[in-house]
């Protein structure tokens, strides 16, 4: 906490993103500790000179403007994916003209702009009636950029658990690495171990390290041996101009 106080001194704003939620707590765990550290630094400033600091291992905030405005964000609930656009939204929230929400959620839609079915519309109306401001708690960025390296190849597979899609993806990753020397990042979407259930597999290969770790919204090729894929997914989502669907 002594290092945190020194790092945050004089900052205009600080956003803390945590992959947890504690609805009955005053704050989430990390932001709670950071807020306590800032409070101790302010107490040091109120005490005056260095010799009279109440917390000698903490920084001294001599004026109120030394303390940053703190924002708290919650992400990844229910294993939901965090996109680069979500991080952009967290930063835009702090900027002048932004929403300035002190607590918010990323990567989750409490209510959607358009319901998929009439029953879902009824359900969302019930949520809006019970929680009128629930939509204000979700934040999205103004854009979701493609941060994959230049020359990257991105593939998404839609299949059914037990059909061997995961093994196919693993073999493809090993082949690209051994023959081309590409850096590989690949992962099955959660739930792929359930036989008979729809599953998704993501793979990207690039001549340099791949720094992002999320589902790919920009893909060069989509492979699907599942004839019913359009009934439970949108396999064309994120397919680039000139991309391939097999």
Predicted regions and their residues:
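Anionic-ligand anchoring segments at beta-strand to alpha-helix junctions in alpha/beta enzyme folds, i.e.
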Residues: 1, 150-222
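Glycine-rich, anion-gripping cofactor-binding loops and their flanking helix/strand elements
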Residues: 1-32, 36-37, 197-238
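Glycine-rich phosphate/diphosphate-binding loops that line cofactor/substrate pockets in enzymes
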Residues: 6-13, 144-152
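Structured core elements
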Residues: 15-16, 71-72, 154-159, 222-224, ...
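General beta-strand structural signal in soluble alpha/beta enzymes
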Residues: 16, 72, 106, 184-188, ...
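Peripheral docking tails and interdomain loops at the edges
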Residues: 17-136, 141, 161
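Flexible loop/turn segments at secondary-structure boundaries
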Residues: 22-24, 78-80, 163-165, 192-195, ...
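ADP-ribose/adenylate-binding Rossmann-like module
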Residues: 236-246
């Amino acid at each position: 906490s002594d290092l945190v106080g020194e790092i945050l001194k004089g900052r205009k704003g600080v956003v803390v993103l945590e992959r947890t939620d504690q609805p009955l707590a005053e704050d989430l765990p990390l932001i709670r500790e950071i807020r306590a550290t800032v409070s101790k630094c302010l107490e040091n400033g109120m005490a005056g000179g260095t010799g009279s600091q109440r917390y000698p291992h903490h920084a001294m905030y001599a004026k109120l403007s030394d303390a940053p405005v703190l924002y708290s964000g919650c992400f990844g609930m229910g294993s939901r994916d965090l996109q680069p656009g979500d991080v952009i939204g967290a930063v835009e929230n702090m900027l002048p003209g932004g929403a300035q929400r002190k607590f918010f959620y990323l990567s989750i839609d409490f209510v959607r702009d358009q319901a998929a079915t009439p029953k879902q519309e009824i359900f969302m109306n019930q949520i809006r009636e019970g929680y009128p401001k629930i939509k204000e708690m979700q934040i999205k960025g103004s854009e979701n950029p493609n941060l994959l390296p230049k020359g990257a190849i991105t593939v998404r597979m839609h299949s059914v658990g037990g059909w061997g899609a995961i093994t196919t993806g693993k073999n493809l990753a090993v082949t690209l690495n051994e023959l081309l020397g590409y850096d590989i990042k690949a992962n099955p979407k959660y739930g792929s171990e359930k036989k008979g259930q729809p599953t998704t597999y993501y793979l990207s290969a690039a001549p340099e390290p791949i720094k992002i770790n999320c589902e790919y919204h920009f893909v060069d090729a989509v492979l699907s041996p599942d004839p019913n894929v359009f009934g439970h997914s949108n396999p064309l989502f994120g397919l680039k101009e000139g991309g391939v669907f097999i």
